[in-house]
Amino acid sequence: MSNQNERVAAAPFQEAVESPAQRILWERLRTYDHSFPLSDYSPETLFSSDLQTLEHEFRRFGVSELDRGDQDNYVNGYDALRSFHERSRSASVMGSPYGNLEDVPYLPSNPFFDQTPWSDDAYGYMYGIRNTLLSRAKDGIESHMLQYVIAKGLKETIDKIFDNLISHVCELMLDYYGHKVFRKLMEKCTDEQITRVLDIVLEEPFEFVRLCVHTHGTHAIQGLMRSLCSEEQISRFMETLCYVSLLLTKDVIAHRVILFCFNQFSPSHTRYLLEVIVQNCYQVAIDQNGCCMLKKLIRQSSRELRDPLIKEIISIAVRLCGNCYGNYVVQYLLRLKDYEVTSALSKHLDGNYVQLSYDKYGSHVVQKCLESREFSSRRIIAELLSDIDSLLVDPYGDYVIQTAWIVSEDHVRHVLLFYINRNVPFMRCNVYGRKLLQKLNIWT
């Protein structure tokens, strides 16, 4: 008997079902009835006002007026994720915003966002619960919705979003999703708002460094740099950056801020930053990340910027050659194949080739100099002959002699062969000497 009454009560609604979207609404109402049993769904029911509100919420999201493509999407996965604000309001009526799922976890078929969640009021979507705007910006799905609102919203909407996030700007810049919202917001901010962000970011140098060395923070800082437009803003930023630049150049992540700065701003703005790097060139070059930054800076910068840096590197080239990281900076200058650079470098290295050949890292530089067409290999070999007896049995010098043998012409090779033959008995008693004889195929 109860089943018959249930069919009678449901009949008016079943007759009204004309589209997949309305079937969805019908299924949701049946779920609501399962959670809160009612005698019927007539307007006189105690909960009729709640049901009307519920139906209005469905229509607000376009359920009752979908086109054919949207209907197909909702048929295949009608449980598209709604905003947190809408879910919280639905939960007060239905218990669970997606029906009585018992212990089954909810996995939305549409992992992105509603098609038109801000159809009524763009800012009303997020402003309903004021304190959750930061959590929305840090949410994987709702951050996309917030970025859309920022991109399409009016100035009043952006101002309200900015006022709610400005006090949490540093936390936002360090978050995986939040820093994307921050960068989008910077594109829409006024000069006054950007200045307010600068006041917070640059207030404490330690906090600024913490942002720059963070994976997401460094991208957020670069987004802020793109938004700087006035001379005052750029000058304030560069002043703080110069103060901590030595720390940033030695960090694997933060050195990108230094490189981006030279690409983003004019030489007049980066002049003092370049001076700091040049004055501390040796400290930067002997650091693992610093040497990489110097090579990128030389490769990417204009001649106006890189010439002072190259000049300083050449002046300390002998010291750099003996360092495990600094020698790569000197080798990079050889790869430029610039006659003026190699000529100046050759003048500073002359007289030091023997000393460098005994060094683990310096020997690599000597080998590169021998292979470089811009260097005179004959002059280098002539210097090596002054102490060739020791180089032939040295663990690093023997590699230099091998390279000299390969790059030398016949008449120079005959000179090398004379000295090698003279030291064969001594070389046979030494592990490195024997290896050299085998490499040169002159084992006798």
Curated annotation (Swiss-Prot):
Which residues does the UniProt record annotate as the domain PUM-HD?
Answer: 107-444
Pfam families annotated for this entry? Answer: PUF (PF00806)
Q: Name one GO molecular function term.
A: mRNA binding
Q: Which GO terms describe its biological process?
A: post-transcriptional regulation of gene expression; regulation of translation
Q: Does the keyword Membrane apply?
A: no
User: Which spans of this chain does UniProt mark as Pumilio repeats?
Assistant: 128-163, 164-199, 201-239, 240-275, 276-311, 312-347, 348-383, 384-418
Instruction: Say where the protein is mainly found.
Output: cytoplasm
Which CDD domains does this UniProt record tie to the protein? Pumilio
SS bond partners: none
Enumerate the PROSITE patterns for this protein.
PUM (PS50302), PUM_HD (PS50303)
Q: Which UniProt keywords apply?
A: Cytoplasm, Repeat, RNA-binding, Translation regulation
- Mention any one GO cellular component term assigned to this protein in its UniProt record: cytoplasm
Superkingdom of the organism of origin? Eukaryota
UniProt signal peptide: none
Record-linked SUPFAM superfamilies: ARM repeat
Question: PANTHER family, per this entry?
Answer: PUMILIO HOMOLOG 15, RNA BINDING PROTEIN PUMILIO-RELATED
Q: What is this protein called?
A: Pumilio homolog 15
Q: Which gene encodes it?
A: APUM15
